[in-house]
Structure formats: structure tokens, C-alpha cells
Regions:
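Alpha/beta-hydrolase fold catalytic core
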Residues: 2-4, 10-11, 18-67, 90-91, ...
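Active-site loop/oxyanion-hole signature of alpha/beta-hydrolase fold enzymes
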Residues: 95-135
Length: 307
């Protein structure tokens, strides 16, 4: 299932440079000397796990119920910024760099949501964690959804941030058209963006950046519809977007309704609320700065701590 990949927001050459710089500005105060999106200063040193033929980079922060954080396309786990220590106050946060991203080198296999979801499941097995909460942003939201679909017994709750369920109607039309232009051919034009700078700072093989763009571009060109998989999830979901995201708020409301949300008054005792989903629309947040927005950690933390 090629789903949610378009949510990466890496659209046209001009749009990439302009919008990604917004994300760098929004989290600049949290960065260390490794460059934009390098994460909060004093971050714990990471480790590598051999899973499915890939050396998967991960970090563990805090203690408590395990929470896996999955980053967006061309980013790394560190792009969650100060939301990492905020969530680690009450959770054992497992921060992962997905295939070909951050400190995890690419391997000779297609970059698919299914394969990356299986990597996460294998990592949890290796860490002897039978069940965890999984929170994904953009591309990471697609991976998180796949973990819930393919390994339902390993997921207690899901948090999907800025994650479209389908290409048709999931994005503003002009963005969908631009997304199909991503390829390694735009690598030089990415120089100066926070994603390029982060990759150059931490990637094991810096020469692979055009290859990463090619792989992401390949599946971004495909139309997708993950509605049926979203409906069939056996785990409760918090669906979160910004009110100025690359997808219209109506898409989030539609997703909420698919999980029995927004269909009745919740009642004084809350008995009428959906047991399958909650919806959060973060005010003033765009697709490019929501990942490090402190409200995200507050809303997600509250949701995850509910029975």
C-alpha cells in the first residue's frame, strides 16, 4: 500500500526552499551545532539496531510507557525539537531515523511504508517491547499507520500528525500537482534548506542525498487512498493537523467521522464521544512548523495518558 507519501510537502523546487526554511526558523532556538533540525541540545547518544538488513538508528529518551516517534520525509527524528524532552517527561520515547534518513543509511531495497513499518516492529522486538504507542508526522504518519495495520498487536494508541489519507482531496490541488516534481534532479536546489543541511551533517553517506530524493519522488508520484485501512485500524487514533496545513481542515473532519467522530453530542459524561478517535486542529500551525509546535506535545501527551 503506497499511502500518505505525498504528505512530505516536498513539492516544487521553489516551494521546497521557501517552506522548509519556515521549519528551520520555528525551531532554531532548540538546535545544536549540527545544523537545523539537529534536535535539542544535550540529546542522548543513539544506537544502531540490525533489523531487516538495515542498520536502524534510534535514540531513547525518558522513562515510562514506550512511545515511538517517526519523522517526516527528508528529516530525522531530531526534527521533533523540544517536543522530544516534553514527551519524554512521561514516556520512554524511542526516536527513530527511518530508512535513508538522518543517521540511517539507505540499503538496496525500495523505500516503502510497508518495509519501514516492518523495521519499526522489528526494532520493538529487538528492544523487547511488546506494545507501544506510535506517533508519526507526515511521512512518519504513513509509516505509523502501516505499523497499526500490519502489526496491530504491537500498537496501543496511534497519533497521526499532518497525515493525509488519500491523494484525491487530501491536499490542496496545487500542492498535489507540485509534489509530483520531486526527484534527485532538484538536489542542488535543495542546498541551503534545513533538510539538506541536516542530511549533510549526520548522514553516513552524504552522496546518497539525490538517491533519497529519487526514492521519495518515485512513490510521491503515485495516487493513493488509505481510507479503508484507516477505518479498519484496531487501535484508537488521535488525528492532528494544523489549521494552515497542506490539507484542508475538512479532510481532518472527514477522517474523524470515519472513526465515529463528530456524529453526536458527547454528553455531560462524555459517553457520546468516539471511542475510536480524537481530533485536534492546531491553531496557527502549518505543515512545515507543526512538528516542533509545543501544543502538539501537550495535546498528544494528554491523549496518550487517557485510559
Amino acid at each position: 500500500m503506497r499511502t500518505i507519501q505525498g504528505a512530505l510537502g516536498l513539492a516544487s523546487r521553489a516551494a521546497m526552499v521557501m517552506t522548509l526554511m519556515v521549519a528551520a526558523t520555528s525551531s532554531a532556538a532548540a538546535q545544536n551545532t549540527e545544523g537545523p533540525w539537529a534536535g535539542p541540545a544535550g540529546a542522548a547518544p543513539g544506537k544502531y539496531a540490525d533489523v531487516n538488513g538495515i542498520k536502524l538508528y534510534y535514540e531513547i529518551h525518558g522513562a515510562g510507557w514506550p512511545l515511538v516517534l517517526l519523522h517526516g520525509g527528508l528529516g530525522a527524528g531530531s526534527m521533533f525539537g523540544e517536543n522530544i524532552p516534553a514527551l519524554a517527561k512521561n514516556h520512554r520515547v524511542i526516536l527513530v531515523d527511518l530508512q535513508g534518513h538522518g543517521r540511517t543509511a539507505d540499503i538496496d531495497r525500495p523505500m516503502t511504508l510497508e518495509a519501514m513499518a516492518d523495521d519499526i516492529a522489528a526494532l520493538l522486538e529487538k528492544l523487547q517491547i511488546p506494545q507501544a504507542d506510535v506517533m508519526g508526522y507526515s511521512l512518519g504518519g504513513g509509516v505509523a499507520l502501516e505499523v497499526g495495520v500490519r502489526h496491530p498487536e504491537m500498537v496501543r494508541k496511534l497519533v497521526l500528525v499532518s497525515t493525509a489519507l488519500r491523494s484525491d482531496g487530501g491536499y490542496y490541488p496545487e500542492l498535489r500537482a507540485m509534489q509530483k516534481g520531486v526527484s534527485g534532479a532538484v538536489a542542488d536546489q535543495m542546498k541551503g534548506t534545513p533538510m539538506y543541511q541536516l542530511y549533510m551533517a549526520v548522514a553516513p553517506r552524504k552522496q546518497d542525498f539525490p538517491r533519497l530524493l529519487d526514492k521519495i519522488g518515485t512513490f510521491m508520484k503515485s495516487d493513493f487512498d488509505a481510507t479503508s485501512q484507516f477505518v479498519a485500524l484496531k487501535t484508537p487514533v488521535l488525528y492532528m493537523i494544523g489549521d494552515a496545513d497542506m490539507m484542508p481542515p475538512s479532510h481532518a473532519v472527514e477522517a474523524f467521522a470515519l472513526r465515529d467522530g463528530g456524529k453526536r453530542d458527547g454528553g455531560w459524561d462524555g459517553a457520546g464521544r468516539s471511542k475510536l478517535a480524537q481530533l485536534a486542529i492546531i491553531p496557527g500551525a502549518t505543515h512545515y512548523d507543526i512538528v516542533a509546535n509545543p501544543v502538539v506535545a501537550v495535546v498528544a501527551g494528554r491523549y496518550l495518558e487517557q485510559p
